[in-house]
UniProtKB/Swiss-Prot annotation:
Species name: Chloranthus spicatus (Chulantree)
UniProt name for this protein: Small ribosomal subunit protein uS11c
Biased composition (Basic residues): 9-24
SUPFAM superfamilies per UniProt: Translational machinery components (SSF53137)
Pfam families noted in UniProt: Ribosomal_S11
Gene label: rps11
Phylogenetic classification of the source organism: Eukaryota, Viridiplantae, Streptophyta, Embryophyta, Tracheophyta
Similarity comment: Belongs to the universal ribosomal protein uS11 family.
């Protein structure tokens, strides 16, 4: 009986280095999801595979401070710092949501030194779809 050929990078023989760290990504897509409670920044390659991500919560902000512009700026800086180290030079930015961190995250992305192809607002807007929830009485 023949022995199976060991595959490089398989789980059995143990990886020496992570596959994500070895990739060089010249161009990527930065997704910013800004809600009223938190801001999530995800960096993907052009095929949509996640390379790096960060949020205001993982950046050390808790409670109502997660929704602040400063928290969004910190989260964007943390997510982008890792991909700039991996060699990313150009990026497209997709911004989604009504949160306070939209502009602050974009400001942090612009300051990072990446060349931005375009900035697109992809906030979902209903064409009179579902009935919205009732108004809050505070």
């Amino acid at each position: 009986m023949t022995k199976p050929i060991p595959r490089i990078g398989s789980r059995k023989n143990g990886r020496i280095s992570s596959r994500k760290n070895g990739r060089r990504i010249p161009k990527g897509v930065i997704h910013v999801q800004a809600s009223f409670n938190n801001t999530i920044v995800t960096v993907t390659d052009v095929r949509g595979r996640v390379v790096s991500w960060s949020s205001a919560g993982t950046s050390g902000f808790r409670g109502t401070r997660r929704g602040t512009p400063f928290a969004a700026q910190t989260a964007a800086g943390n997510a982008i710092r890792t991909v700039v180290d991996q060699g990313m030079q150009r990026a497209e930015v997709m911004i989604k949501g009504p949160g306070l961190g939209r502009d602050a995250a974009l400001r942090a992305i612009r300051r990072s030194g990446l060349l931005l192809s375009f900035v697109r607002d992809v906030t979902p807007m209903p064409h009179n779809g579902c009935r919205p929830p009732k108004k809050r009485r505070v």
